[in-house]
């Protein structure tokens, strides 16, 4: 049995709106914290005006009051300050929206099982692909058996954390897709496979000497039980890509062509007779009048551009009433008259489709570039996923605005970024748990989350909108490493006592 790993360091990142102002005098004297704010948030560029206070040296309490989305990191403060601050926050467990764990993920999963057993709503992971194309900490080019062993141990352990209705989604490429498919079927069962999505993540294609240039990856989705299902993606009627309109009563509708297309739209039966929904609609271009009973100058039949007879989406007996209510109209499209109607529906969501070609799924354009703009450096982390694609996966896994999402191959922290973005968009209270073993935990993963909490938009490492921050508490901990165990690490007494107290009492809070 693997030896228990101890929590060797525990800290919190807390937005100032959640910090009692009695701590402000101590905060403005903390040079390490202020230096981080200058480097991370460029607070020295904040200028004052008639109503606001700008940056100054020394920093003022009023400046803190007016910039309450700044994130305090307890690692810059004494053990005494940390204890007093944490003790002053009511309902710390409920208010903590994120947990970051610097650890080998198998040990972290075992530790998480103490508090989160059967309570995680969704797991999203982007593990090593076991190919030369994914350069990450785990040694790629494993033999199949070694890679499968790595994955089986972690996926099996993480299943204990999923709630009954929970889902797990895994990003993978062609190289290990067949083996992963077999593994997931063995762990979750064939009947709990809810679909596989093909995502265009590299529109330019992957350089190759002999093979087809791959532009895609996959996301495999499995449910934890028969009660698991894919959620519909929310539809925002104000999003112009959906073409929703407001009627005169302020109700959203979608303009839809009355002529049906696709499955079950053929008007002719096998014997050559026509279905009842193949009928003429009469139209007067001058008055705009539409009727099925009164013959008018123009006769419109549901015949498509290829001359195929289709059917209307509505029966003949309701058309005149719909016109009287202002729900039917005709417009000329490319020289032909088309009949449209107001569709009052669809806002309950849309089904997730198996192919994603959205430009926002591009890892280079919407993964790497976004991360570079946040961190202000190029290529500090290779091949990060696009937040949009991860957000889609999260929404498909859970429609709960207080869902708990786990990623135990956290990498650059895209999953945490996606959760924060979703909460910012719909005022949700989702929580994220990220596990990462790499040293870039402190140079990429943690800084990224701290920056995304502060602002939604970044360019060249600087915030572009200081008013887009979210109120938040995030906790990050480090577990004892295998090397620490071998070395029989000894902590400074004060730090050891604090780590034991906070790491035990508040470990997963």
Regions found by a protein language model. Give the residues of each.
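Conserved proline-anchored active-site loop of SAM-dependent methyltransferases
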Residues: 118-133, 184, 405-419
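Conserved beta-strand signature within the Rossmann-like core of class I S-adenosyl-L-methionine
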Residues: 166-170
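Conserved P-loop NTPase mechanochemical-coupling segment
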Residues: 84-100
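Mobile active-site "lid"/loop adjacent to the S-adenosyl-L-methionine
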Residues: 121, 128-150, 165, 175-176
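Accessory, often C-terminal, charged low-complexity segments
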Residues: 1-79, 97, 113-117, 155-159, ...
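Phosphate/oxyanion-binding active-site loops and adjacent basic polyanion-contact surfaces
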Residues: 101-105, 143-151, 381-389, 441, ...
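Conserved RecA-like ASCE ATPase "motif II neighborhood" in helicase/translocase motors
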Residues: 101-118
């Amino acid at each position: 049995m693997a030896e228990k790993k101890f929590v060797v360091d525990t800290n919190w990142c807390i937005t100032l709106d959640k910090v009692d102002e009695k701590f402000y005098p101590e905060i403005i004297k903390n040079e390490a914290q202020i230096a981080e704010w200058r480097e991370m948030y460029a607070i020295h560029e904040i200028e004052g005006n008639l109503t606001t206070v700008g940056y100054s040296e020394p920093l003022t309490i009023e400046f803190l009051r007016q910039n309450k989305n700044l994130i305090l990191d307890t690692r810059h403060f004494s053990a005494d300050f940390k204890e007093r601050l944490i003790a002053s926050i009511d309902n710390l467990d409920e208010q903590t929206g994120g947990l970051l764990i610097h650890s080998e993920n198998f040990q972290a999963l075992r530790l998480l099982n103490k508090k989160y057993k059967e309570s995680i709503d969704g797991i999203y992971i982007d593990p090593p692909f076991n190919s030369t194309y994914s350069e990450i900490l785990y040694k790629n080019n494993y033999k199949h058996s070694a890679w499968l062993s790595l994955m089986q141990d972690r996926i099996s352990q993480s299943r204990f954390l999923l709630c009954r209705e929970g889902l797990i989604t895994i990003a993978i490429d062609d190289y290990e897709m067949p083996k992963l498919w077999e593994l997931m079927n063995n762990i979750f069962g064939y009947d709990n496979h809810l679909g596989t999505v093909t995502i265009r993540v590299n529109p330019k294609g992957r350089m190759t000497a002999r093979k087809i240039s791959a532009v895609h990856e996959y996301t495999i989705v499995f449910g934890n039980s028969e009660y698991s299902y894919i959620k519909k993606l929310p539809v925002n009627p104000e999003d112009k890509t959906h073409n929703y309109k407001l009627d005169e009563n302020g109700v959203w509708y979608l303009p839809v062509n009355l002529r049906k297309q696709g499955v079950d739209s053929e008007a002719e039966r096998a014997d050559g007779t026509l279905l009842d929904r193949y009928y003429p609609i009469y139209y007067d271009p001058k008055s705009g009048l539409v009727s099925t009973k009164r013959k008018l100058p123009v006769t419109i039949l549901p015949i498509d551009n290829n001359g195929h007879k289709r059917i209307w989406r509505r029966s003949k007996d309701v058309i005149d009433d719909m016109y009287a209510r202002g729900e039917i109209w005709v417009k000329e499209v490319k020289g032909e008259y088309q009949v449209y109607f107001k569709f009052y529906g669809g806002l309950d969501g849309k089904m997730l489709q198996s192919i994603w070609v959205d430009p926002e799924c591009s890892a280079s354009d919407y993964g790497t570039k976004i991360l570079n703009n946040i961190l202000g450096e190029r290529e500090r982390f290779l091949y990060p996923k696009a937040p949009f694609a991860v957000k889609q996966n999260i929404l498909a896994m859970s429609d709960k605005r207080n869902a708990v999402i786990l990623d135990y191959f956290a990498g650059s922290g895209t999953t945490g970024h996606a959760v924060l973005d979703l909460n910012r968009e719909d005022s949700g209270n989702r929580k994220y748990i990220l596990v990462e073993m790499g040293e870039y935990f402190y140079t990429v993963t943690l800084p990224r989350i701290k920056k995304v909490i502060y602002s939604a938009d970044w360019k060249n490492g600087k915030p572009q909108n200081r008013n887009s921050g979210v109120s938040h508490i995030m906790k990050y901990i480090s577990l004892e490493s295998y090397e620490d165990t071998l070395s029989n690490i000894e902590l400074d007494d004060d730090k050891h006592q604090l780590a034991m107290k906070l790491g035990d009492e508040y470990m997963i809070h």
